[in-house]
Structures are given as structure tokens and as C-alpha cells.
Amino acid sequence: MASTIRILELVQSLEKGGRTIRFSDTISGLREHGHFVLPLCLSKPKQWVNIPGLQIIEKQTGINWTLVFQIRILLKQNKINIIHAHCEFSQLYASIAGFSLGIKTVATFHRSDLAKYRPNLVNTLIQCFASQFVAVSHDRLSLLTESLKLPANKCHVVHGGTIIEKVPTVESINKVREELEIPQNQVMLLSIGHLGVIKGHQDTLTALSQLISKNQNIHLYIAGDGSAPEKQQLSALVEKLQLQKYVTFLGQVNNSFKWLEACDIFIQPSIEEAFGLVFVEAGAKAKPVIATAVGGIKEIILPEQTGLLVPPAAPEE
């Protein structure tokens, strides 16, 4: 199939998480449909990132207007006719560069942090220069139209998705548990997400300390990375609650689908979440989920059917 659209896909960074998965899947899907896609990242990604043709322009700290001219050059060189930018600074620089060349920009908002949806100079400029706006959930759509005052007719919702494979069987679960060296009779809880407070790991640990008095065969595995202070804070809480025997920090994993298949329950009581692609991935593995009734999670979990929704920052629940 001949290329019909030439697209710049632009992202600020490529840490592990839903935004990176969505960025990569979008590129793959567009290419499979015969479109030309130029992927661009404004920071050097980790070695595990594998996106063919990825270009990098490293953004300096603070506002860096030279990026507008660098992006403009790429747009002209590659004859781009539409820009898709993910998150605020990518949207800012790309939309201005595109506007100067008559190229329209679609801006997708992924942020969980509610502060990113407050009126400010950057968001005002994005509104001026971008053409269409995408929210990853209806919850975030309301922030675009009510907080940022973006025109409703230019705002859209596109949920994230994942590939649905075969539902795990007892045999496949036993096999992957053996591979991951997880006892077959262990009640395995799993969390996947960076170690920042916003993901609610501290609440999971507090709840676990209450559960082990009833069932000492429970073990929590936490997959994800974080800053040194974040790691230290959670490790200190594990020691304070005397959970050393019941918690394993896995660090960053590249085989999260295996851990999801192995677990009995996926648990992540996020303080805030724009969408929560990992909950979709857990559902695709037919796993019950314990999550919080915040952000886009409410659009994924069916209470009492596919999981439980609890209030945020309420481990006693």
C-alpha cells in the first residue's frame, strides 16, 4: 500500500508506562496501514526502547525555543503533513513549528498529574497553535473543556488498548510461575508502575500489613523503577511494617505480560490516573483488579464484575 499520510509522532520522553506503549503502538499501527511515520523523542531513551527510525533531539532544561526551528527543519525535510504530539512541551514546540508551515497538530494529553491541566502560558499557546485535542479518558476530556476551556468540538476521547491473546489456562499459569520461580500455592499480588507516590504503592503496603494476619501465604511483587528517594521511602515502609518476607521489588521488567499471567490479583491503588493502560492489560489476562475510583480507571473496571474500586489513599478499604 502506498503512503497516504506523512506523520510526525513526537514525545517528550520514553519511560516505561502507558504513554510509551501507546506511542509505540500508534507508530506500528500507522505503518502497518501504509503511512510514513517519523518518530521523534525530546530526550535520549533507555536501551530497552526499540522503535525503528526513532530520532532524538535532546531538550535542554527549561523553555528551549531552538527546538521549534529544529522540528521545523525535520518537517520540511520529511514532507510531513500532520503532527501528533504527546504531552505539553512536545505539543508546544511542534504546534508552533507546524503552524508556521501550515501543518496541523493533534495534541494528545496523557498526564495523570492534575496540575498539568491548569491554565498557564504553555497550555494557552498549545490551544492557539494546535488544531485538535485528544484525551485518553472521558475524565480527562472534562478537564480539557472545563479547566483549560478548549473548544468541545475540537476535543475527542481515544482510549488506549492492548492485544487480547488467549485467556491464560491453569497449565500456562503454572508454567510461567515455574519460569519466574513463584511458588504454585502462593497468593500472588502484583503491581506494575513507577515508584512515585501517585501510584499508591504505600497504600498497598499498608493494606498488606493488615492482610497477613489472616493469610501469611500472600506475597506482593512490585514491578517498576523510581528515584533513589522513592525507592528508599518504600523500602523503609516495608521495614517499618515488617513486610520483608512478603514483598519483592522487581525493578524495571521487560516481560510484564508474564508477570500479569502469573499473578492472582493485580492491585494498584493510584492516587490519580489519566487512563491506566495497565488495568486493561490485566483484564486482557483475565485477572481481577483492585484499583481506585479515580481518573480513567472508572472507565475500565466494572465494579464487582472485573474488579473492586476503592477510594484513593484509603488502605483500610
Regions found by a protein language model. Give the residues of each.
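Aromatic "clamp/platform" in nucleotide-sugar-dependent glycosyltransferases that forms part
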Residues: 252, 271
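Short hydrophobic beta-strand element within catalytic cores of glycosyltransferases
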Residues: 288-291, 301
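N-terminal strand-loop element at the rim of the active site
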Residues: 9-66, 228
